[in-house]
Amino acid sequence: MALVRINGLERHYQMASETVRALDGVDLEIIEGERIILLGPSGSGKTTLLNCLSALDSPTGGEYQFSGIEVPKNDSEAMTTFRRENIGYVFQFFNLLQDLTVLENLLLIQELAGSRDEDRARNLLSLVGLENEVDRFPA
C-alpha cells in the first residue's frame, strides 16, 4: 500500500495580474519505507508540495492521501486535526524562545495547541535524552 498517493495535485497563486502555477498536475506515489528526495531550484515548488502534503496549505486541485486517508482541504479545523494526528513536521528554521527554559518552550507549544501537561512534556524530553536539561535555557 502507498504511504502517500498524489493525483493531479495543483497549487496556483494569484499574483497581481498573473497566476503562478507552483504545482501543476503533480502525480506521485511513495511506498512505506521508501526514501525520496525533492530536488529542484529555488521556486520550483518543493516547499509548496510539502506544505500541501502536511495540511499546512490547501491545493487548488487534485487529490492526495496519506496512509489511505484523504487529506482535508480548505477546512482549517479539519486540516489542523489531520496534522496533529498524522504528521510530524520539522521546520527548516526552528527556533526556541531564548528567555524560556527547555521545559517552558515545550509547555508553551502545548498551550498554543490547547492543552498543558507537564508530565507529558517531561516524558517527551526523557524520550530524547533531555530529562536533565529541563531548566536550561537554549544556547
Where are these regions (language model features)?
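Conserved ABC transporter NBD signature motif
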Residues: G62-K73
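A short, flexible loop at the N-terminus of ABC-type nucleotide-binding domains that lies
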Residues: M1-L3, H12-G25, S76
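Walker A (P-loop) phosphate-binding loop of ABC-type ATPase nucleotide-binding domains
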Residues: G40-S44
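Helix-to-loop junction immediately C-terminal to a conserved catalytic motif
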Residues: S54
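Conserved ABC ATPase "signature" region
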Residues: R5, I69-E70, R116-E133
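ABC-type ATPase nucleotide-binding domains, specifically the catalytic core motifs of the NBD
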Residues: Q14-A16, L107-E118, L127
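Short coil-to-helix segment of the ABC ATPase nucleotide-binding domain corresponding to the Q-loop/switch region
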Residues: L97-I109
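ABC ATPase NBD coupling module
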Residues: S17-V20, V71-G88
